């Protein structure tokens, strides 16, 4: 992992750690798989409460690109918001491509035991 990714990940944790509707933040994508380039984006899954997910869905924000806090050339956060129940179902019953998407994923922060 490049230093700019480490810094961006710390910024991402800071962004969500005090939000009680965020249960966990999980690193995915090329960085989690060890295939990153210096300009790779930071892919993250933000695990939220069902109520937060419904609001994000209603606002059409279950995925979003965020540039704030990811300040290297070409860098941004590619965020996907899911519930814990969705991720459990994906792990148990998801297609191979869905399960592969989470392979090597790494929990960055959790408040869920």
Predicted regions and their residues:
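Metal-dependent nucleotidyltransferase catalytic core
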Residues: 1-23, 31-39, 45-100
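Ligand-binding pocket scaffold of soluble enzyme catalytic domains
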Residues: 27
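Catalytic cores of NTP-dependent nucleotidyl/adenyl transfer enzymes across multiple folds
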Residues: 99-113
């Amino acid at each position: 992992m490049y230093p700019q990714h480490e810094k961006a990940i710390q910024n991402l944790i800071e962004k969500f750690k005090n939000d009680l509707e965020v249960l966990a933040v999980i690193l995915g994508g090329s960085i989690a798989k060890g295939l990153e380039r210096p300009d790779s984006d930071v892919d993250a899954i933000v695990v939220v409460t069902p109520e937060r997910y419904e609001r994000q869905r209603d606002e059409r924000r279950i995925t979003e690109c965020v540039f704030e806090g990811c300040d290297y050339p070409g860098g941004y956060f590619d965020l996907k918001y899911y519930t814990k129940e969705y991720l459990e179902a994906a792990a148990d019953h998801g297609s191979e491509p869905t399960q592969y998407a989470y392979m090597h994923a790494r929990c960055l922060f959790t408040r869920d035991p």
